[in-house]
Amino acid sequence: MKILIPTAKEMNTDLPSIEAIPLKPESQTVLDALALYSASQLESFYKVSAEKAAEEFQNIQALKRQTAQHYPALKLFDGLMYRNIKRDKLTEAEQDYLENHVFITSALYGVVPALSPMAPHRLDFLMKLKVVGKTLKSHWKAVYDEALKKEEVIFSLLSSEFETVFSKEIRAKMVTFKFMEDRGGQLKIHSTISKKARGAFLTALIENQVQTVGEARRLNFAGFVYREDLSQPQGLVFVKEV
């Protein structure tokens, strides 16, 4: 069983660095394409300020020169979902579960264990980077599928732009999750609720060593409970009353 989570734009580098590992050939090809952009070109590519683009340019060039600092990916990314994941003071069993079951899907690194070394960078599958004439999605599709072809159960906490990198055959094995709030009988869903809940849900998976869909249904976390009446066999819905 594998649990898939996306990358995040926000990063925290106020961490002890760890040793890098060599980039896979598929990652190196992506980096080579990204490294062709000047700082001013990155400004429009990323749709960010000149200051932010200059910072990203330095990050890319450091990776290219193999001088970039690397950090455990799960701790480097620091978006709302990540800030709601238990990342410190893990028991030995929780650490083992994290290492064996939780994987990050990256447009630069591929599908990698959550604690893999990563350098600060910005790239997702909505960005129109051409890699040897291919889109990012088509460049990665075979590698993404290969990473999961032996899995019977895949828990996806990904957004659609990450899920659609995988073939239909792999997506057919995915169990997806929706998190909603019940406000006086009205069910609401928005990105802040979803991101926080994904992090809390992953924490519950880790703490309870969940291996099956049945075990996931029984979880009660951060006020969320499973709603069978709203769920499908491979699309579980959790609701929090507020």
Swiss-Prot record:
Domain of life, per lineage: Bacteria
Give the taxonomic lineage as stored in the record. Answer: Bacteria, Bacillati, Bacillota, Bacilli, Lactobacillales
The protein's matches in NCBIfam families, at most eight in alphabetical order, are given as:
PRK02101.1-4
Q: What is this protein called?
A: UPF0246 protein SP70585_1589
Family label? Belongs to the UPF0246 family.
- Provide a GO biological process annotation: response to hydroperoxide
GO cellular component term of the entry, any: cytosol
